[in-house]
């Protein structure tokens, strides 16, 4: 599959003409392979996914949207997935989801940045995706923590990995292992 964009300004009117032309050109070069692009806008604002064969979306319910509100993740994502599928009638892949976690921070009840919160966040996302038969794939963001430019929102890098930068597992890694074992 050709993935030709990640989080473009797909709510802008100019994006419609641009991506229509780009996808036509790609289909001339390779008519066999499906085309996709990854969106981060609301479905109501999207102007380009009709040109793709598969809809890909990055979603961070419980993190960038409704941070700390674990109970809103499942209903928010499920509603969002259904809207995308109803609008375009195409398979959907959730290409990014997750929450930052400080390795070793354990809190009950789970609070943002705790390992328990990351685990629950991933589980709530998985529950919503599992109930939508048109969801054909998912990708947790990210495999491992990584360094980014310093900023007030990023202390010592991106911490959304289910493994640390040193490749040590966080609590969520064990939950994912169990999820994948059940799929075999």
Where are these regions (language model features)?
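Short intrinsically disordered, low-complexity coil segments enriched in acidic
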Residues: 1-7
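Substrate-binding clefts and catalytic carboxylate motifs of secreted carbohydrate-active enzymes
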Residues: 2, 16-28, 36, 44-184
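Short, small-residue-enriched loops and turns at beta-alpha junctions
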Residues: 7-11, 43-45
